[in-house]
């Protein structure tokens, strides 16, 4: 866990340096698809980690649904799909893809490009990790280290269940 935290911190540091862009690039996401899907128990049964990924890009609807599952706003009062200690909502999700690094704006349900560089190779040393179409990096601004880890774990689990529901490897 410590190594992964250091790697994520390194990626975020690179983002801070490389993120200075002349113009702000945003990408609106489609509304989350709330229809259909497997039962929770089926998704739990099928949830697993794998070491094989296709090189196909993830379409916008799938990415929108995945990010909404991670930390999306699911109530009128602005609360999220994951619980956060004292409703701190201190977790930010970054999407690393071939076309750069994008920050997920949960309130606006959109992506904001923070770098146009493909930083995915910085995340993993295993060969299989390089084949993933995208990586999600969870960054917490919580002053309490355990809260950030707890929030990231909740978001990660939601994404895992979403992927199981859709038959996606994660």
Language model regions located:
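Bacterial N-terminal signal peptides that target proteins for export
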Residues: 1-7
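Short small-residue beta-strand/loop micro-motif enriched in glycine and branched aliphatics
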Residues: 6, 52-53, 144-145
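Bacterial N-terminal signal peptides
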Residues: 8-16
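Short alpha-helical scaffold segments that flank and stabilize functional sites
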Residues: 13, 72-73, 166
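N-terminal amphipathic, basic helical "cap/leader" segment at the start of enzyme domains
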Residues: 22-132
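Small-aliphatic-rich amphipathic alpha-helix that forms the alpha element of a beta-alpha
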Residues: 47, 66, 93, 134-170
